Amino acid sequence: MIIPCIDLMDGKVVQLIQGREKALEGGSPLEMLARFAAFPQIQVIDLDAALGKNLDNDSNDSLVELVASRCIARVGGGVRSPERARALIEQGAYRVIVGTAAFDREKLTGIANAVGRDRLIIALDSKGGKVVTHGWREATNFTAEEVIRHLEPYCSGFLCTYVDKEGMLEGTDLDWFRRLRAATSHELTAAGGITTIGEIKELHKLGIHAALGMAIYTGRLNLAELALLNA
């Protein structure tokens, strides 16, 4: 499955390079939903919340709710408490994505209990070979391949981002995704640098979904062609 991404920052749809440099702004969330109407699921990431900004009074909340109420949406960014996870479900999110909190056993258990493991996706973001957290700003000392099996009991799938190539339109690391596929039977979604139809087809052979951002916002990949692949 191909999953278009809507990333929100300061109330706008944006695309970043490696989670830091803003590369472009898209249309409004409703305009993006109209463009992505042929796709069964949309991924929504609140970048401000992921970076720890305005967690208690997030300016993007109304936009997240707007999108989630109009499509089947997986929503993430700054989900670090059971209350936040539950609120997103109540706003219309079909599934919730948890990153940083997945590495705090108490928080992860609380979130999984709050929304149910079937509605929980854990984000495993890799940079320089190691898992990174807190909006990709803090590195751990372990790899995604090492921890993925330990996290399986808490979720129904993983969103795995190859941060080294995120937003750079230079292709992703298919070998990394092959190793992840060998490490778990859980649902996997690949993100980070996916630029060609060939990469998407290779991921499909592995049984891995593709979350796409920069490649579709820049027109590198054609939405009509992607929709046919998704059919």
Q: Model regions: which residues?
A:
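Catalytic cores of alpha/beta
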Residues: 63, 69-95, 175-210, 226
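C-terminal helical cap(s) of enzyme catalytic domains, especially alpha/beta-barrels
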Residues: 106-115, 120, 200, 204-231
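Short catalytic helix/loop segments, enriched in acidic residues and glycine
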Residues: 19-37
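Structural preference for beta-strand elements that scaffold enzyme active sites
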Residues: 1-5, 41-44, 72-74, 94-97, ...
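Non-catalytic positions within long, well-ordered alpha-helices that form the structural scaffold/packing
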Residues: 35-37, 89-90, 151-152, 204
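Charged helix-capping and loop-helix junction motifs
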Residues: 55-64, 137-146, 170-179
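Glycine-rich, proline-tolerant flexible connector loops at the mouths of alpha/beta enzymes
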Residues: 41-59, 100, 160-169
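Conserved anion-binding
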Residues: 8-22, 93-166
